[in-house]
C-alpha cells in the first residue's frame, strides 16, 4: 500500500507519518493487516509535479492540509477549499478512485458559537466538495470533523493546551481568562489509532446534533470517539501538579486512557533539556543512604536503599504497613521474625538473581549486606507514604 499524506509537516501529519513508518518498518506490530510500502509526504515546500506523481501512485490519501491562522479571512477558503479542489482534480486526472480521508473541523457544523466562523465555512465547503467527488467517482470518502486537537505543536498559535504546557514547563507567564471554559479534546495518539482503524476499514461513523457527535453505524461522517471534556481550570491545575512532581515526588493518578495520563505525556514534551534531570533528596549516614523516588496517591511509595559492606538495616516491625524488598545489586540476607509466635525465616538475596521479598505486618525484619567490599542496593516499595506523625514503625531486633 502506498499512502499519500498532505499537510505532512503539521502536528497531525508529523505524528501520523512517524507512526505509519513504524508500521512500514516493522517496529509496530499491532496492525499486522497493514502492509505499507511507500509514504508520500506532501507539504507547502512540495511541488505540483510531486503531487501529480503521488496522486497517480497512492492507494490511500490522508488530506490533512489546511489553513488555521491566515493573514486574512479570504485565505481560509483558498487554503482549505482551494487545495482540496487541486487534490481531487489530480486524482481525477489519473482516474485514481482510492479512499481519501478529509481532516475537517467541528466548526464546520456552523452551530452555536461557530455560526459565523469563516474557518468553519471553508471547512464546510471542503466537505461538500469531497462528498460531491464521492458521488461522481464512487470513491470512498471519509470526512472527520475533529474537535480541539491535543498534541505537540507550536505554543501561542492554535492550541491553548500547548500554550499552557509550554508556559508551565518553561516558567513563562500565562493567563486563563475563564477557568470554567470547557474544551473537548482529542489526543494525537488516539487520532492516529483512529486513522489506522480507517486504513483497516474499521472506522466509526457518526452524525452531528449541533456540535455534539452522535455515533451512528451508517452516519455520513467518520469520527474518533475517544475525546475528553475538561475545563481550562482543570488543565492548568494538573499542569501545576506535574511541575511540582520533582519536588513533591507525588505522581498523579493516571489510569489507562485517562486525560491526566495524556496531558502528562504532552507536558513532558515541552520541558527544556536542562529540566530533564532533577536531584533527589538522599538521606545519608555512615551506614549508606535512603532515597525516596516516587510517591503515589493510592499505591504508596518507591525508594532506593544503599547499605555499605557489613551493615544491617531495619530491625523493626509494622502493624499495617507492608513492604517489598528487591535487591538489584550486591549480596544480602533478609531476616524476618513473627513478633507473636517467634517463627523466623531468612532469604539470601542477590543482584544476580532478582527476587522480591515481602515484609509482612507483624514480622520484625532486617536486611544485612553480606559483602565485605560491595554496596547492597535494594529497591523498596511500601503501601503508604511515610508519615512522621503516624510512622507505624517499631524497633525490635530480629
Spans of model-derived segments:
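N-terminal Rossmann NAD(P)H-binding glycine-rich loop of SDR-like oxidoreductase domains
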Residues: 1-26
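A short glycine-rich, His/Asp/Glu-containing loop-to-beta-strand
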Residues: 274-315
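Double-stranded beta-helix
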Residues: 341-343, 368-398
Amino acid at each position: 500500500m502506498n499512502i499519500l499524506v498532505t499537510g505532512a509537516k503539521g502536528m497531525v501529519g508529523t505524528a501520523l507519518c512517524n507512526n505509519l513508518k513504524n508500521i512500514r518498518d516493522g517496529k509496530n506490530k499491532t496492525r499486522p493487516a497493514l502492509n505499507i510500502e511507500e509514504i508520500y509526504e506532501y507539504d507547502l515546500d512540495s511541488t505540483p509535479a510531486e503531487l501529480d506523481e503521488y496522486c497517480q501512485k497512492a492507494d490511500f490519501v490522508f488530506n490533512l492540509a489546511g489553513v488555521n491562522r491566515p493573514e486574512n479571512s479570504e485565505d481560509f477558503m483558498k487554503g482549505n477549499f482551494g487545495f482540496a479542489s487541486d487534490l481531487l482534480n489530480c486524482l481525477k486526472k489519473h482516474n485514481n478512485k482510492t479512499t481519501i480521508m478529509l481532516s475537517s473541523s467541528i466548526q464546520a457544523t456552523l452551530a452555536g458559537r461557530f455560526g459565523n466562523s469563516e474557518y468553519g465555512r471553508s471547512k464546510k465547503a471542503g466537505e461538500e466538495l469531497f462528498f460531491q467527488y464521492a458521488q461522481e467517482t464512487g470513491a470512498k470518502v471519509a470526512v472527520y470533523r475533529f474537535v480541539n486537537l491535543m498534541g505537540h505543536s507550536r505554543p501561542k498559535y492554535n492550541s491553548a493546551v500547548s500554550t499552557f504546557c509550554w508556559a508551565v514547563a518553561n516558567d513563562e507567564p500565562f493567563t486563563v481568562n475563564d477557568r470554567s471554559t470547557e474544551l473537548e479534546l482529542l489526543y494525537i495518539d488516539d487520532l492516529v489509532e483512529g486513522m489506522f482503524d480507517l486504513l483497516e476499514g474499521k472506522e466509526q461513523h457518526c452524525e452531528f446534533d449541533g456540535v455534539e457527535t452522535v455515533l451512528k453505524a451508517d452516519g455520513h461522517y467518520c469520527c474518533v470517539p475517544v475525546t475528553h471534556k475538561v475545563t481550562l481550570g482543570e488543565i492548568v491545575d494538573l499542569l501545576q501538579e506535574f511541575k511540582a512532581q520533582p519536588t513533591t515526588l507525588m505522581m498523579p493518578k493516571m489510569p489507562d486512557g485517562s486525560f491526566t495520563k495524556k496531558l502528562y505525556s504532552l507536558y513532558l514534551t515541552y520541558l527544556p533539556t536542562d529540566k530533564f534531570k532533577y536531584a533527589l533528596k538522599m538521606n545519608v549516614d555512615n551506614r549508606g543512604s535512603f532515597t525516596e523516588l516516587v510517591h503515589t496517591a493510592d499505591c504508596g511509595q518507591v525508594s532506593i536503599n544503599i547499605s555499605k559492606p557489613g551493615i544491617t538495616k531495619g530491625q523493626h516491625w509494622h502493624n499495617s504497613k507492608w513492604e517489598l524488598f528487591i535487591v538489584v545489586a550486591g549480596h544480602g540476607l533478609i531476616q524476618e521474625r513473627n513478633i507473636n509466635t517467634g517463627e523466623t525465616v531468612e532469604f539470601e538475596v542477590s543482584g544476580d538473581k532478582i527476587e522480591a521479598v515481602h515484609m509482612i505486618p507483624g514480622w520484625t525484619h532486617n536486611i544485612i549486606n553480606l559483602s565485605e567490599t560491595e554496596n547492597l542496593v535494594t529497591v523498596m516499595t511500601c503501601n503508604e507514604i511515610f508519615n512522621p506523625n503516624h510512622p507505624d514503625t517499631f524497633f525490635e531486633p530480629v
